Amino acid sequence: HIFMMRDEEMTYNPENETVGENILMKRIPIKNGQEHIEAVEEAVQKIARALRRTRSKIARRVYRDAFPDGHQEIMLVYPFSSWSEFEGGVRGLPEGFQDRYEKIYGKGSFRKEVMDVLSAHSDGVTHEIMTMVK
C-alpha cells in the first residue's frame, strides 16, 4: 500500500481547483540516497517556480510518500480535459512549457535540470491515466 501526502511547496494549483474527471499521474520512484531525493525535489521545485512565474492555467499537484521505507517516491498529478492534450510536448505540462522554462533558467536548462536529473536520480517515470466513469 502506498500512502501519499500532498506537498504544498511543490504543488502549483492556481485556482485551487479540485481533482477533475480525468487525471494524468506521473510516478517517479527515486533512487535510494539523500542526494537522489534532493536532486529530484529540486527539479520538481524548479518546475513549480516556472509554472508560478508564467502564471500557468494548468494545475500540478505533487504528492510524496507519507511513510517512506527507505525508498522515496513522488507523484505528479495533472488534470486534463481532452486526449488531444497528449499530442507532442511534455505530458501534463502546458504546451510550450519547455520554451518558457528555458526563458527563465537559460537555454538547454530543461534537458539539463529536469530530464537529465530525472534520468540520473530516479528509476524512470511511469504515466497512469485515471478517468471517472459515470
Can you say where each PLM-predicted feature lies in the sequence?
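Short S/T/G/P-rich N-terminal loop/turn motif that feeds into the first structured element of a domain
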Residues: 1-134
